[in-house]
Design a protein with these regions (language model features):
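Short, conserved secondary-structure transition motifs
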Residues: 1-6, 162-164
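Extended glycan-interaction surfaces of carbohydrate-active proteins
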Residues: 4-112, 140, 144-146
Length: 259
């Protein structure tokens, strides 16, 4: 509530500071691509929305509108250059309504794949799939195997760890969530399809078709107390080992009230 009351400017979250030029490396009224990082982590860990969902969507749309560039030909960056020329990317920050500090935070004009994945993941969780795909397609066009290796997303060095934020895209698209204390494996995909999943002791593939789920275990042992698909519990009474598949799991019928 305090974050909303103090930092919300009607479109996105900002930094409140008396004089943005009194200290180096601030951003003030700028649109920060990282402004929903806490929401990103909350979603990955099954905590849902920690700020108002409508404000999440508004802030995400502001990030895409103001920070995404389809072509960086006219963009100036005096720091590291991870995207250039007619390539596109998501800037770490922008000041569409002015107010750029005299010395903004370092790297503000750069493009980081890890932040692009993080923003795209949060967009998926917020139901903004088209915007998420825009960010990811722009990124993938830079790493298409022509100028850069698709297996090495470079930031401050080769194979930089922040790009592992891309795993969040899988979790957001599949709605996969493993609750270890409750031993519950849940799926809430944005659409039907096949998805990878992991638990503490198993990994494999999940196939979702409507209210039907089939699990294929590729490694380890899946020993869950409960399987949930789109909020409804599915029957799975026995553990599954590597090489095994479940039957097609369906929720029990909802009891009909007798007239």
């Amino acid at each position: 509530e305090a974050m909303d009351a103090v930092l919300w400017n009607g479109e996105h979250y900002r930094q409140v500071i008396d004089d943005v030029d009194a200290h180096r490396y601030q951003y003030g009224e700028g649109v920060l691509s990282d402004q929903l990082l806490g929401q990103f982590h909350a979603r990955l860990n099954g905590l849902g929305d920690i700020v108002d969902p409508e404000r999440v969507r508004s802030a995400l749309r502001a990030i895409v509108t103001h920070n995404h560039r389809a072509d960086l030909t006219g963009h100036e960056s005096t720091q590291r250059v991870y995207a250039l020329g007619d390539e596109g990317g998501l800037l770490l920050a922008s000041w569409p309504r002015g107010g750029r500090p005299a010395i903004p935070f370092v790297y503000s004009d750069e493009v980081w794949t890890g932040v692009e994945h993080q923003v795209a993941t949060t967009l998926l969780y917020a139901g903004l799939a088209d915007e998420a795909l825009l960010i990811e397609r722009t990124l993938r066009s830079r790493y298409d195997g022509t100028a850069r290796s698709p297996w090495n997303e470079i930031e401050c060095g080769n194979h930089y760890a922040r790009s592992l934020a891309s795993w969040g895209l899988l979790l957001a698209a599949s709605g996969a969530q493993w609750d270890a204390p409750a031993r519950t494996l849940s799926f809430d995909p944005i659409d039907d399809g096949a998805f990878l999943f992991t638990t503490d002791r198993a990994w494999g593939r999940a196939e979702v078709h409507g209210d039907e789920l089939t699990l294929h275990i590729d490694g380890g042992i899946l020993d869950a107390d409960q399987i949930v698909l789109r909020g409804r519990a599915l029957p799975l009474s026995e553990p599954l080992a590597a090489g095994q598949s479940s039957p097609a799991l369906r929720p029990d019928p909802i009891p009909q009230e007798t007239p």
